[in-house]
């Protein structure tokens, strides 16, 4: 009898490992993303990025003890026009607010991050997040992002 719970646990672990740990990976959508990277320390990253079917994860609500709750989603495979770099990342924003808390952007092997993502706004009505001249850094290297990243409409309440 003791083998049954052990077998069930092993089966569950195998299934979760097979599907990436049970997380919500980005799936292609019919939502448009369009942004530009400017003033990059690595000038090969500068340019227009966009996708007509941006891969997005679902929006997750993160309940935090002693701090304002957050909403978070990921995006991936947003190519630069003309080839080269491909963008992916994570957007975190405060619940019941248009305030972006953090943007993490991965480009050409570098991870650029902003806490207090500059001039940015979450628009629940338009299902997107807009950035206007937001500076992100990877230590000393920096990039500036201006444009829009979509988010799914089937979000948890307050997100």
Locations of regions flagged by a protein language model:
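Bacterial N-terminal signal peptides that target proteins for export
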Residues: 1-8
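Repetitive helical segments and hydrophobic/amphipathic motifs
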Residues: 11-12, 70
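An extracellular/secretory-lumen and virion-surface interaction module
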Residues: 20-159
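C-terminal motif of bacterial Sec signal peptides marking the signal peptidase cleavage site
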Residues: 15-18
């Amino acid at each position: 009898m003791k083998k049954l719970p052990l077998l069930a646990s092993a089966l569950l672990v195998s299934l979760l490992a097979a599907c990436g740990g049970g997380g919500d990976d980005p799936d292609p959508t019919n939502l448009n993303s369009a942004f530009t990277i400017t003033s990059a320390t690595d000038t090969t990253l500068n340019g227009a990025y966009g996708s007509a079917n941006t891969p997005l994860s679902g929006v997750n609500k993160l309940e935090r003890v002693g701090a304002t709750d957050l909403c978070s989603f990921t995006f991936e495979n947003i190519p630069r026009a003309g080839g080269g770099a491909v963008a992916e990342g994570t957007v975190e924003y405060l619940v019941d607010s248009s305030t972006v808390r953090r943007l993490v952007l991965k480009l050409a092997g570098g991870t650029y991050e902003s806490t207090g993502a500059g001039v940015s706004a979450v628009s629940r009505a338009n299902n997107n997040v807009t950035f206007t001249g937001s500076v992100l850094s990877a230590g000393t290297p920096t990039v500036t992002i201006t444009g829009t990243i979509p988010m799914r409409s089937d979000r948890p309440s307050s997100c």
